[in-house]
Amino acid sequence: MNIRIASTVLCLSLVVGGCARLPEQLPNNPKDQVDLDIPRPTGIAAAPWPAQEWWRSANDPELNRLVQIAFARNPDLRAAAAKVLLAQADVGAARSRLLPHFDADFALTQQYFSAQGLHLSANGTSNTFGALNPIDIHYHVDLWGQDRDLVRAARGRLAMNQAEAAQARLLVSTAVVVQYFALEGDRRLLQQTEHLHTLQEQAKAVAEGGFQQGLFNASQIHAEDLALAESAQRIAKLQAAIAAEKHALAALCGEGPSMTIGSATITKQALSPALGLPKNLPLRLLARRPDIVAARWAVQAAAAEVGAARAAFYPNINLRLLAGWNSIHLGDLFNPGNFAHAVGPVITLPIFEGGALRAHLRAQNAVFLAAQDRYRSTLLAALRQIADRLSTAQKLARQERAQRHAAAAAQAQWELRQQAWRQGLSDALPSIAAEITCVQVRQRRTAITTARWQNWALLESALGGGYRHTIKDG
C-alpha cells in the first residue's frame, strides 16, 4: 500500500513540476489607442455608406461589364479564393484534433530465427507473425486547451483570408474604375487636342497668308509652327497613354492586350459632385473595411497561437484503446487465446526540450505583437486615405469653380473676336486664337473632371466599397 502511495505521489510531482519551465516574462505591447476622429471638412454632408456594387453609380454599362469580367477572370482574385479554400481545410484539420481517431491495422511478417537465438521454442525455425487490430482508438485529452486554441487560430486565419479576398475584390474593382476613368478622360483630351491641332493649322495658314501680304513677320509663322509641334507631341503622348490604359484594363480583366474596351457613357448627372461621409464613421469603419477586418482577425489568430504554445509546456495526455489478435503462427491467429486488448493513458512530459518550447512561445508572442502593430498601422492608413480623399475633393471643387469662370470668360472673348472678324474689324487670327483658348480651358476642365471621378472612386474604396463583415465557416 505504501508503495502505491509513493508511486502516486511521484507521478503527480512529475506531472506538476517536471514540465518544461515557462518563460518568466514575455514582452508586452502598450495598449495605446488610435485616435479615430476624422475632421469633417466644410461642405461635406452626411451620406449613406457605399453600396456593395458602388461602381454602378456611374451608370456606365461598359464599366459594369469590365468589373464583372475582372471578378470572374482576374488571377489575383482566383488566388485569394484558393487561399480561402486552404484556410477552410485548415479549420477542418484543426477540428479533427478534438475528436477521437479510429484506426485499424494488419501486419504480416515472415521471420527466420537463428538456431542459437533468444526464442528457444522458435530457434532454427521460420515463422509467420500475424497481427490484426480492427479497433485502435486514440483520443487526445485537451486538458490545457491547446487543441481548442489551435481551432480558434484556424478559424481566425479563415476569417482573415475571407476578409483579404474581399479586400482583393475591392482593390481590383477600384483599379478597374480608376483606370477606366483615366481612359475616358484621355479619350476626351485626345479629341480636344486634335481639334486644337486643327485650329492651330488654320492659324498657321492665316499667318502665312498675312506674311505674303506683308501683314505679319516670320516670327508669327514660327510661333504657329511651335504650337503645332507641341500639340502633335501631346497627341502622340495621349495615344500612347490610351493604349497603355487599355492594356492595363485588359490585364485587370484577366485578358490579353487585344481586348476591346468600349467608349464610356458617363454623364454629368451620373456621379454626384457633392461627396458625403457616413454618420458614425470612425466606429463603423472597423467593420466596413476588409483590410481592417483582416488585420483584426490576424491579431486574434496570433493570440490563439500564443495560447497553444503555452499549453505545450504542460503534460500531453492521450487515451488509447486497442483490441485485436496476434500470433506467432498465422494459422491460429483467430484462436480465442490469441485475442489481445489494451487500454490506458499515455502521458508525455516535456521535461527538457533544449529550449525549443520557450523559443516557440517567444516566436508566437512576437507574431502576436507584430499583428497588433499591423492592425494599428492598417487603421491609421485607412483614416489617412479618407482624409486625403476629402481634402482632394475640396481642392478639385475649387479648381472646378475657377475653371467654370475661366470657360465663361474665354467664351465671351471668343464671341467678341468672332463678331469683330465678321464685321471686318480684324483678321481671322484673333478669333482663332480665342477659340484655341476656349479649347485649352476645356482641356483643363476635362482633366479636373477625370480627377474628380477618380477621387470619387478612391473615396468609395476608402470607405470599404460596400463591404460588410461576415464569417463563412469551413
What is the predicted role of each segment?
Residues 211-215, 421-425, 462-466:
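A short glycine-centered flexible hinge/capping loop motif at secondary-structure junctions
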Residues 2-72, 131, 155, 239-287, ...:
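Terminal intrinsically disordered/low-complexity segments used for targeting and assembly
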Residues 63-65, 86, 130-132, 178, ...:
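Transmembrane beta-barrel architecture of outer-membrane proteins
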Residues 78-79, 95-96, 141-169, 219, ...:
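Sec/SRP-type N-terminal targeting helices
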Residues 49-58, 105-136, 259-278, 307, ...:
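Small/polar, glycine/serine/threonine/aspartate-rich low-complexity segments that form flexible
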Residues 147, 156, 163-281, 392, ...:
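Periplasmic alpha-helical coiled-coil/stalk elements that build and connect Gram-negative outer-membrane
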Residues 67, 134-136, 180, 282, ...:
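Membrane-embedded beta-strand positions in outer-membrane beta-barrel channels/transporters
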